[in-house]
Amino acid sequence: MAKLALIEREKKRARLVAKFAAKREALKAIIEDQSKSEEERYEARLELQQLPRNANPTRQRNRCAITGRPRGTFRKFGLARNKIREIAFRGEIPGLTKASW
């Protein structure tokens, strides 16, 4: 199990990303817009730099919903591989069966 502080840090990052998503998209649109003046684009770039680092979605890490494990997490289930295995063997994930050929 991951430390609770790490799990809480990821939750905080998720909240920050959601909070600043609209502002971030608007600033990026201004920066990419070639019809805007160079000064406007420069101001937007400076304003984008002033946003918190953790508001950037690339800083988020997918973690297991049960254990908080950062690696080996399946996006479809939101669980780590070992937890998927345990739950699947108990038959709690509908339609998921062990492969055989």
From Swiss-Prot:
Superkingdom as given in the UniProt entry: Bacteria
Q: Name one GO cellular component term.
A: small ribosomal subunit
**By its UniProt entry, which InterPro entries does this protein fall under?**
Ribosomal_uS14 (IPR001209), Ribosomal_uS14_bac/plastid (IPR023036)
Keyword tags: Ribonucleoprotein, Ribosomal protein, RNA-binding, rRNA-binding
- GO annotations under biological process? translation
Provide the assembly information.
Part of the 30S ribosomal subunit. Contacts proteins S3 and S10.
- UniProt similarity note: Belongs to the universal ribosomal protein uS14 family.
- Report what the protein is called: Small ribosomal subunit protein uS14
Organism of derivation: Burkholderia multivorans (strain ATCC 17616 / 249)
Chain's gene name: rpsN
